[in-house]
């Protein structure tokens, strides 16, 4: 679910990690904090490297951070657009802070799903199917273990040098098989195929992979949800300003509408304004909106620009809860460095 352009990190991923510093951005001050606290792993939302480098000389802060991380044997891992797109990610954390219910993806991701079709002897179909489900197949919305199964007849002739599970070398064999169809995220393809090959009884399992253009309702950009009770525009904006400690909250003209259906996207999410309007949202909250994006929207929707840093500052809490659940005894620290480069008078 990571977008193709997103960088992921720096350093030796096989190195034993003794402690992790959790942050939004990687800066020289954050690296100094990691060194001082004995953390040899930094987990950030925004990646340090956004473009390719042909030389690293220390001429800017990114190059200085790269050199400092390498010299001090610090690994940097960044979960950027994958955390933006994921259920339970950045936007869901914002929704949690605001108190939204019935939260769902505003702009579901497309072309990220694959259909797998394979053919298995009837007696082994259940075992193979369960292995596929365990590897990540068959999840559709609030349902798992989803598949479609039809029985048919497969034929093959084993050649010299083969060791067929059924049939005889040199003779045409007919076998009653089950055609299993199921769905999976593209990023799980390798894991799923390994599971299929490990459980399928045939030497040469037949399987097909089909790219799908379906929307993936559980993954994508932005979210939309509802407040328990409607609020006035001013009441809502003041509450948002306080929750996210916003120094300067920008918004378009107040029209007296009540706010109940809320759409949002952490970071630079102005590209989702049309989707928010189409979804009938009363307000769209994001970190950055360009000047011209405000024009012509007064009657459509309330726009609220709270700042890029402010909208994503609680990302550290997501990292903490995920890692703490998986590794309860691993040393985790929240960075105390405010990396927001924007200041307000």
Task: Give the predicted meaning of each segment.
Residues 25-26, 46-48, 81-82, 123, ...:
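Active-site metal-binding loops of divalent metal-dependent hydrolases
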Residues 12-44, 48-110, 120-121, 168-173, ...:
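Active-site loop-to-helix "anion-binding N-cap" substructures in soluble metabolic enzymes
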Residues 1-14:
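Single conserved hydrophobic/aromatic residue that forms the stacking wall/gate
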Residues 8, 34, 42, 94, ...:
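Divalent metal-coordination and catalytic microenvironments
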Residues 289, 298-307:
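Conserved beta-sheet core of the metallophosphoesterase superfamily
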Residues 97-234, 246-250, 254-258, 271-273:
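Positively charged, small/polar-rich N-terminal and surface patches that mediate targeting and assembly
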């Amino acid at each position: 679910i990571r977008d193709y352009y997103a960088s992921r990190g720096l350093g030796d991923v096989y190195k034993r990690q003794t402690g992790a510093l959790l942050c939004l951005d990687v800066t020289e001050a954050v690296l100094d904090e990691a060194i001082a606290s004995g953390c040899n792993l930094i987990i950030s939302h925004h990646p340090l490297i956004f473009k390719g480098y042909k030389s690293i000389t220390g001429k800017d802060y990114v190059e200085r951070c790269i050199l400092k991380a390498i010299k001090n044997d610090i690994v940097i891992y960044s979960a950027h657009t994958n955390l933006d797109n994921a259920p339970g990610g950045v936007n869901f954390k914002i929704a949690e802070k605001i108190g939204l219910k019935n939260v769902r993806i505003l702009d579901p991701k497309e072309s990220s799903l694959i259909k797998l079709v394979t053919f298995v002897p009837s007696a082994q179909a259940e075992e193979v199917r369960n292995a596929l489900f365990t590897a990540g197949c068959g999840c559709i919305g609030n349902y798992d273990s989803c598949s479609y199964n039809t029985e048919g007849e497969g034929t093959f002739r084993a050649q010299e040098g083969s060791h067929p599970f059924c049939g005889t070398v040199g003779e045409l064999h007919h076998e009653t098989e089950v055609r299993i169809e199921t769905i999976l995220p593209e990023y799980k393809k390798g894991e799923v195929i390994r599971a299929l090959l490990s459980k399928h009884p045939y030497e040469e399992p037949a399987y097909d992979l089909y790219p799908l253009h379906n929307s993936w309702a559980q993954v994508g950009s932005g979210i939309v949800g509802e407040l328990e009770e409607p609020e006035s525009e001013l009441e809502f904006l003041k509450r948002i300003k306080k929750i996210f400690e916003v120094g300067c909250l920008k918004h378009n003209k107040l029209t007296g509408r009540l706010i109940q259906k809320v759409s949002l996207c952490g970071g630079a999410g102005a590209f989702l304004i049309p989707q928010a309007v189409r979804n009938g949202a009363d307000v769209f909250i994001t970190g950055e909106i360009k000047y011209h994006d405000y024009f012509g929207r007064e009657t459509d929707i309330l726009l609220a620009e709270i700042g890029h840093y402010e909208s994503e500052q609680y990302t550290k809490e997501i990292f903490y809860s995920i890692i703490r659940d998986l590794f309860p005894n691993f040393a985790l620290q929240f960075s105390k460095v405010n990396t927001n480069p924007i200041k307000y008078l």
